[in-house]
């Protein structure tokens, strides 16, 4: 193509010389830039087609990369600007009339190109003189062109903004407006919500798991895809690392702090299982390998309701119900106590059941894009919850702002502390026993009966020392219900209302005994003694008063004290040659500072002498052998005390002695401790496997007493210790069957109340243990009046 020949023409009369020079300059530029012009025209035509089809078209459809292109267009100013071409700037006579709307549309297409096509330029040049007479002056026309260009730019911006708003409305449905949207917690909410919205295919989690499993088997495969749960776990871990760095104290080598010394040999946390692999391993061990799966993906199935049979699968650890049409969640979801991950996102849920708060093992709860307006206070029980996804819900601003400012853990703590005393348990019923031991069913409440010459009552109660009642240990308890002032008032009221003849308490602080319990009990006709744990001997006077121990009280008008003896298990063992000093004895037994308090009392009405033992054994289930050895030593030493104060060496007299052993034994029914008490012997029990304690493991444990649990008639209580990590019966009152008979028992805690609770203490129960109470009758003809 010869540009010079095509565009040459004769000078036009009356045309200014400056315009002719400008034409020559333009022709020279066109001649030099022909190749670039054609390339630019092709690129611009493609951009116009994409723009008209993708953004400016009437049928806008959002795409996956729309946000990226939109950011480039709006924020980087890369979209096409409508600018006058060189000919329009310097040759106003080349323009057609701008008055008709159809011609304006054509001009808009032309204005987006830097140069006009050459053929059009020739045609306009040939009619230059005629159009010069019809067009207004150059300055006036250029002003009109600028106005037209500005109008078109505004229209483009309006269309782009409309498209951006449409895309934003699709990606940010019901977005919550919080006061601080730039906080790291809220950024995580939005990021994870976007990931969740992208997981809208049926069985999303199952597909992802299968895909990642295939990639894991192929060493050359691409990197595994990161799903919602993995992304959440990563974000939570990074936050915890940052918080840990801020809180990390300086680690000084040397003597432990006072708090560390007080908590020696005491469990200091109620954490369930912090590692996912440990939890899965525990589940497999619990089911003995019979349960091979623990996750269920029902996402994207269009479910409207959930069958109640689903909640019989109490082994489930992950349940995915996202992208369905659920309007509500059944309250029976509380049966899934092992759940760690629950996804209810993208449904139509209006309200969450309070029972969901009983799923205290939950760590990740996703509720994105529902119609939830508030969260129940029972969510304060979710002590393991690390993240709750609430973006896309019309949630109360106070809750949303709390999550945005302080995160999920602070939300749970706030809901927990805002819990009020809404529910009160029914009084514990009183169980009456006939002479043959049969329990009489009754709804009667325990009442203090008139004194009888041959009856007495015994209460055993672990009152929870205030130094152990920490927010870290009892994360599920409202902070106000954990305060000692609140708890001690409940404890005092409870103990005095039962008004038993003998009271055995465990975990009583030394200072609390001296300044609180002793004055209170003395004022109500009791006399009491106290013995603290061994560690108090190695501490200063101030710190030693914070150590806990056992306290025994008895009514002055019912009993008189013959003798009392403090009992340290490790000291007794080391001070006697009859206990073999083995490796296990030193490494496992000697560093436990548990104690017992033995009171030898005489019943004033009958003259019967009764040995009352109050003890608290070691807590750790990994040391069940130590507990069995402690009980073996206790019963062996008790024989010596009875022989001494009954002035007898007869085994028959020892068997017929009146004995009551109370305490927190930290042992369940199938333990070696229970076996030793109830049968009189324990040999070859699994608790002692692989241990060497001399004669206790070679010959087994033996004692001559005939002891029985007071609650054996009812098969023991469902529990005496209730926490999220452990719920079972570990407190007992043992009695000698030849001389004593059980006539009444304090029943269990209201089942309806405990079904809505994950652990004690709470607003109504001041300790993690519940008291046990038994009424005994001295058997006729078995009384021994000798002193």
From Swiss-Prot:
It is found in: Cytoplasm; Nucleus. Residues 37-54 have a biased composition (Low complexity). Acts as a catalytic component of the CCR4-NOT core complex, which in the nucleus seems to be a general transcription factor, and in the cytoplasm the major mRNA deadenylase involved in mRNA turnover. Ccr4 has 3'-5' RNase activity with a strong preference for polyadenylated substrates and also low exonuclease activity towards single-stranded DNA. GO terms for cellular component: CCR4-NOT core complex; Cdc73/Paf1 complex; P-body. InterPro entries: CCR4/nocturin_mRNA_transcr, Endo/exonu/phosph_ase_sf, Endo/exonuclease/phosphatase, Leu-rich_rpt, Leu-rich_rpt_typical-subtyp, LRR_dom_sf. GO terms for biological process: cellular response to starvation; DNA replication; DNA replication checkpoint signaling; filamentous growth; filamentous growth of a population of unicellular organisms in response to biotic stimulus; filamentous growth of a population of unicellular organisms in response to starvation; fungal-type cell wall biogenesis; nuclear-transcribed mRNA poly(A) tail shortening. It is an enzyme of class 3 (hydrolase). It holds the Pfam family LRR_1. Keywords: Cytoplasm, Exonuclease, Hydrolase, Leucine-rich repeat, Magnesium, Metal-binding, Nuclease, Nucleus, Repeat, RNA-binding, Transcription, Transcription regulation. Residues 37-70, 92-137 are annotated as: Disordered. It catalyses: Exonucleolytic cleavage of poly(A) to 5'-AMP. It comes from the Eukaryota. One of its GO terms (molecular function) is 3'-5'-RNA exonuclease activity. LRR repeats lie at residues 291-313, 315-336, 338-359, 361-382, 384-406. Residues 60-70 have a biased composition (Polar residues). The gene is CCR4. Gene3D superfamilies: Endonuclease/exonuclease/phosphatase, Ribonuclease Inhibitor. Its EC number is 3.1.13.4. CDD domains: Deadenylase_CCR4. Its cofactor is Mg(2+). Mg(2+) binds at residue 507. PANTHER family: CARBON CATABOLITE REPRESSOR PROTEIN 4, POLY(A)-SPECIFIC RIBONUCLEASE. This is CCR4-Not complex 3'-5'-exoribonuclease subunit Ccr4. The keyword Transcription applies. Belongs to the CCR4/nocturin family.
């Amino acid at each position: 193509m010869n540009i010079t020949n095509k565009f040459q023409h004769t000078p036009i009369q009356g045309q200014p010389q400056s315009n002719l020079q400008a034409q020559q300059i333009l022709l020279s530029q066109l001649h030099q830039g022909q190749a670039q012009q054609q390339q630019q025209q092709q690129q611009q035509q493609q951009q116009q087609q994409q723009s008209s089809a993708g953004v400016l078209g009437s049928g806008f459809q959002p795409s996956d990369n729309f946000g990226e292109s939109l950011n480039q267009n709006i924020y980087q100013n890369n979209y096409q600007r409508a600018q006058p071409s060189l000919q329009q700037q310097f040759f106003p006579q080349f323009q057609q009339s701008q008055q008709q709307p159809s011609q304006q549309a054509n001009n808009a297409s032309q204005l987006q190109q830097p140069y006009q096509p050459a053929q059009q330029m020739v045609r306009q040049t040939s009619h230059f003189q005629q159009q010069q007479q019809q067009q207004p002056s150059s300055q006036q026309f250029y002003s009109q062109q600028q106005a037209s260009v500005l109008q078109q730019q505004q229209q483009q911006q309006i269309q782009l903004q409309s498209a951006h708003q449409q895309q934003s409305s699709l990606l940010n449905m019901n977005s919550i407006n919080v006061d601080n949207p730039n906080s790291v917690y809220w950024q995580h909410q939005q990021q994870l919500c976007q990931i969740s919205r992208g997981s809208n295919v049926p069985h999303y989690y199952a597909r992802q798991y299968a895909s990642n499993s295939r990639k894991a088997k192929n060493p050359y495969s691409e990197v595994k895809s990161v799903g919602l749960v993995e992304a959440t776990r990563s974000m939570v871990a990074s936050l915890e690392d940052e918080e840990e760095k801020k809180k990390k104290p300086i680690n000084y080598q040397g003597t432990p702090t006072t708090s560390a010394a007080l908590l020696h040999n005491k469990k200091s946390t109620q954490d369930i299982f912090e590692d996912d692999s440990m939890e899965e391993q525990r589940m497999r061990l619990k089911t003995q390998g019979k349960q091979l799966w623990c996750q269920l993906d029902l996402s994207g199935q269009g479910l409207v309701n959930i069958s109640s049979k689903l909640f019989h699968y109490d082994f489930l650890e992950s349940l995915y119900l996202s992208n369905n049409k659920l309007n509500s969640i059944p309250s029976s979801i509380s049966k899934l106590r092992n759940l760690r991950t629950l996804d209810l996102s993208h449904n139509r849920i209006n309200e969450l059941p309070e029972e969901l708060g009983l799923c205290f093992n939950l760590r990740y709860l996703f509720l994105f894009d529902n119609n939830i307006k508030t969260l129940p206070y029972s969510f304060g029980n979710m002590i393991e919850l690390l993240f709750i996804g609430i973006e896309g819900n019309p949630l109360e601003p106070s809750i949303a702002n709390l999550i945005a400012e302080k995160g999920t853990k602070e939300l749970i703590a706030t809901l927990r502390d805002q819990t009020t005393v809404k529910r009160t348990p029914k009084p514990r019923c009183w169980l009456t026993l006939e002479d043959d031991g049969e329990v009489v069913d009754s709804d009667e409440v325990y009442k203090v009966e008139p004194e009888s010459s041959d009856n007495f009552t015994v209460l055993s109660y672990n009152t929870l020392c205030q130094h152990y009642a920490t927010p870290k240990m009892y994360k599920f308890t409202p902070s106000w219900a954990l305060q000692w002032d609140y708890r001690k008032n409940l404890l005092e009221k409870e103990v005095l209302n039962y008004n038993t003849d003998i009271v055995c308490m465990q975990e009583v602080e030394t200072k609390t005994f001296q300044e609180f319990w002793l004055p209170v009990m003395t004022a109500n006709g009791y006399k009491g003694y106290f013995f603290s744990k061994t560690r108090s001997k190695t501490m200063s006077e101030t710190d030693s008063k914070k150590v806990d121990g056992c306290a025994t009280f008895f009514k002055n008008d019912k009993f008189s004290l013959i003798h009392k003896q403090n009992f340290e298990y490790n000291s007794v063992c080391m001070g006697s040659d009859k206990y073999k000093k083995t490796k296990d004895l030193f490494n496992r037994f000697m560093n436990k500072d548990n104690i017992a308090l033995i009171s030898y009392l005489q019943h004033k009405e009958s003259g019967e002498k009764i040995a009352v033992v109050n003890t608290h054994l070691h807590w750790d289930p990994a040391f069940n052998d130590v507990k069995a050895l402690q009980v073996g030593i206790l019963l062996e030493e008790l024989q010596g005390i009875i022989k001494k104060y009954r002035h007898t060496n007869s085994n028959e007299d020892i068997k017929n002695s009146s004995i009551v052993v109370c305490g927190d034994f930290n042992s369940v029914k199938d333990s070696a401790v229970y076996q030793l008490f109830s049968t009189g012997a324990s040999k070859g029990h699994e608790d002692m496997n692989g241990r060497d304690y001399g004669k206790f493991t070679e010959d087994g444990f033996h004692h001559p007493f005939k002891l029985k649990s007071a609650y054996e008639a009812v098969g023991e209580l469902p529990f005496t210790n209730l926490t999220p990590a452990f719920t079972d019966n570990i407190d007992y009152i043992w009695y000698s069957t030849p001389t004593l008979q059980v006539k009444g028992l304090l029943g269990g805690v209201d089942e309806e109340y405990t079904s809505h609770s994950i652990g004690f203490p709470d607003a109504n129960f001041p300790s993690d243990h519940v008291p046990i109470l038994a009424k005994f009758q001295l058997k006729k003809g078995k009384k021994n009046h000798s002193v």
